[in-house]
A protein has these predicted regions:
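N-terminal glycine-/serine-/threonine-rich phosphate-binding loop
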Residues: 1-36, 107
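Glycine-rich N-terminal segment of FAD-binding domains in flavoprotein oxidoreductases
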Residues: 25-54
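Glycine-rich nucleotide phosphate-binding loop and flanking beta-alpha elements
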Residues: 44, 106, 132-135
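Short, glycine/charged-enriched secondary-structure capping and boundary segments
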Residues: 51-54, 77-80, 112-113, 135, ...
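Ligand-binding beta-strand-loop-alpha-helix segment within the catalytic cores
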Residues: 59-126
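Glycine-rich phosphate-binding loop
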Residues: 120-145
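Class I SAM-dependent methyltransferase SAM-binding "motif I" and its flanking Rossmann-like core
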Residues: 136-170
């Protein structure tokens, strides 16, 4: 593991974006395509902003959305689909973006996501760690031995407090 220390969020975001771009370009050079998983949250603001400036052939990329609130419409300020569309997807021309759809039959959507995610190797995962050490809403104590690619989780109180504190919910 490599640890990079940065003085500002902007510097850290630029470092992360450059590394992500390098890995995506390597995957495209090797196999003609790249697959990445994107998360959201305040920790991703600067990374996604800087990633838009990187020279990546996005038309050879398929991206997957990591998580979403159940039954939250895409128009809601806290929607991760809205977050990714506004900050990333609407600015690059990906081959495909696979959203976590949480409206409708959630179990069917989870099965589809799992199938799609497992079709080929994921080249890059862009994730953050929350204030309570959650990774993609897998709050402690999460079952990290699950074989499911996507699961429904119950957020712990610290995670809920973080979401409100960051301004996603009023």
């Amino acid at each position: 593991m490599k640890i990079h220390v940065a003085k500002t969020a902007e510097e850290l975001g630029a470092q992360a974006a450059h590394t992500i771009a390098e890995k995506l370009c390597e995957a495209i050079a090797e196999s003609g395509e790249a697959r990445l998983v994107l998360s959201t949250g305040g920790s991703q603001f600067e990374t996604l902003k800087a990633l838009l400036q990187e020279d990546v052939p996005w038309d050879k990329g398929t991206a997957f959305h990591l998580d979403e609130y159940i039954d939250l419409p895409i128009t809601h300020a806290a929607s991760f689909r809205k977050y990714l569309k506004e900050r990333f997807i609407d600015h690059v021309h990906l081959k495909e973006f696979v959203f976590v759809e949480t409206e409708g039959d959630v179990d069917d959507n989870i099965r589809m996501l799992t199938r799609r995610l497992r079709e080929k190797t994921i080249d890059v995962g862009v994730i953050g760690i929350g204030e309570n050490a959650h990774i993609a809403f897998n709050d402690p104590p999460a079952d990290f031995d699950t074989k499911q690619a996507y699961i429904i989780v119950n957020l712990d109180s610290r995670c809920k407090k973080q979401q409100v504190g960051e301004g996603w919910f009023k």
